[in-house]
A protein has these predicted regions:
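Non-catalytic, usually N-terminal nucleic-acid engagement modules in DNA/RNA processing proteins
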Residues: 1-87
């Protein structure tokens, strides 16, 4: 659920809670096109720089490596070694 924390004019600051964590908005989302962030950053590195959420392109993951492989490895969070929210 999204909750507005502060509003000034048409701008607003808020947050939403998901099963894997809370995300404060506005937010910058790192893009893991095929389940990985370019630049060889680890999940720990991402947490250290304040990454709250990762964006993952499900179409690219469906094409390669494929849904069944991701499922057999324990799902997208385990495949990406990311315990936070994923969009």
């Amino acid at each position: 659920m999204f909750k507005v924390i502060k509003q000034e004019g048409r701008a607003r600051r808020g947050g939403f809670t998901c099963p894997h964590g809370t995300v404060q908005t506005p937010v910058f989302m790192n893009v893991g096109t095929q389940g990985a962030i370019k630049g060889a950053l680890s999940a720990r590195d991402l947490k250290e720089i304040g990454c709250q959420i990762e964006l993952s392109n499900t179409y690219h993951l469906h094409v390669r490596p494929g849904d069944e492989l991701i499922k057999s490895l324990g799902g997208l969070h385990r495949f990406m070694t990311w315990d936070g929210p994923i969009l």
